[in-house]
Amino acid sequence: YQSVSGAGKASMDELIDQTKLALDNKKINSKNFTKQIAFNAIPHIDDFSNDGYTKEEMKMINETKKILDKSVEVTATCVRVPVLVSHAESVNIEFEKDFTLEKVKNLLENAEGCKVVNDQKDGGYITQLEAAGKDETFISRIRKDNTNEKAINLWIVSDNLLRGAALNAVEIAEAYIKSKQ
């Protein structure tokens, strides 16, 4: 879930302008996006490849494999969202071996640059708006995947102008790998 700042200042300005026009119930023309970005989510960032993935999605997949291991299975759908700053990821990680949720949480709490905010209640997580201007990568909504006993789901958010979204996921995976050695 990539903010418009990932597309540059002109795109940030366009979101602000489109929001004003939408609130005034006026016609909106998109210049930097394929569709209206104000009050919308666009599941398309960069050019499409023949396989249906976009260049941005393939970049995320390939960077993860390059840093971790080429055998790591990764898929992604990149979505441009009407937020000025900060990217977010909904991540599912499948482990080879059994794990405890407490061990994963402890590992993440001790990972450099990460801050766990995982209160299982309304508002007990960090949003893109709250992450803007902060150096940490925030990890929330840590839970076991109820469809796969060897997997977890996470919500990861960081200020993309300070840290890259793909880097965050990779650093979390690296921390887990180091803990197994």
Question: For each of these PLM feature ranges, what is it?
Answer:
Residues 1-107:
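Active-site-lining helix/loop region of Rossmann-like oxidoreductase modules
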